[in-house]
A protein has these predicted regions:
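Adenosine-phosphate binding glycine-rich loop
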Residues: 1-36, 182-215
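C-terminal active-site/capping subdomain that shapes the small-molecule cofactor and substrate pocket
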Residues: 101-215
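Active-site-lining helix/loop region of Rossmann-like oxidoreductase modules
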Residues: 3, 11-136
């Protein structure tokens, strides 16, 4: 049997929204990812560091210079003008969470060494408020809520994506738009040590061994 194992950007999002979908039924989702260069490997990290020291260093790993820049392209462009990474977000979300969810993604590479960040905006079938979301996520395994706008408390890659398996959620907002319930969130996770594809694979194997489903 084959088991779907999402990539790092999809994994951290699904961990954060799965409890919400289970209780309030997400039917439309828009996500913008801000992906660290470590997701492209050691050569990408070296390229960023080299360009920070000398902005004239030409790009090899990326199509444009990554230092002091933001590149709205992760992976190659497909015929529909989305990148392959953006389509993976849609495909894997539908495959793992719910095939009926409409998903649109914009994947962006940012000059950060480690830690993927995501701005997620989604609609729920059931009416929901911020307290509902905070309470639900605070009780969910593997999720840490940092959300206190008055004290400027919210997760960032520098502070919260360092050798941790947890997914951090903040900037939680709810709105009623045209009588529909919408939620906005900010999600941060360590894409290398934490909720990356490699760790997911290990945890899936551990679960199968525990349940005696791996021969």
């Amino acid at each position: 049997s084959l088991i779907a194992n999402p990539n790092c950007s999809v994994s951290q999002m699904l961990i954060a929204i799965e409890p919400i979908h289970k209780k309030f039924q997400i039917d439309l989702l828009n996500i913008a990812t801000y992906q660290a260069v470590s997701g492209s490997g050691i050569d990408a990290i070296k390229e960023l560091n080299s360009q920070i020291k000398d902005v004239n260093v030409e790009p090899i790993v990326y199509p444009k210079k990554i230092a002091f820049n933001v590149i709205p392209q992760c992976d190659i462009f497909l015929d529909n003008n989305f990148t392959k990474e953006e389509m993976k977000v849609s495909w894997e979300t539908k495959k793992i969470l719910d095939p009926n969810i409409e998903v649109t993604a914009t994947c962006v590479r940012v000059p950060v060494i480690n830690g993927h960040s995501e701005a997620v905006f989604f609609r729920t079938k059931e009416t929901v408020n911020k307290d509902d979301i905070v309470d639900l996520l605070s009780e969910s395994a593997g999720i840490k809520v940092i959300d206190n706008p008055a004290d400027q408390k919210y997760p960032t890659p520098l502070e919260n994506a360092n050798d941790t398996e947890d997914v951090y959620v903040g900037r939680i907002r709810t709105q009623i738009i045209n009588e529909e319930s919408w939620v906005s969130m900010w999600i941060v996770a360590d894409n290398v040590y934490g909720k990356g594809a490699a760790l997911n694979a290990v945890q899936i194997i551990e679960m199968l061994i525990k349940e005696n489903k791996l021969c």
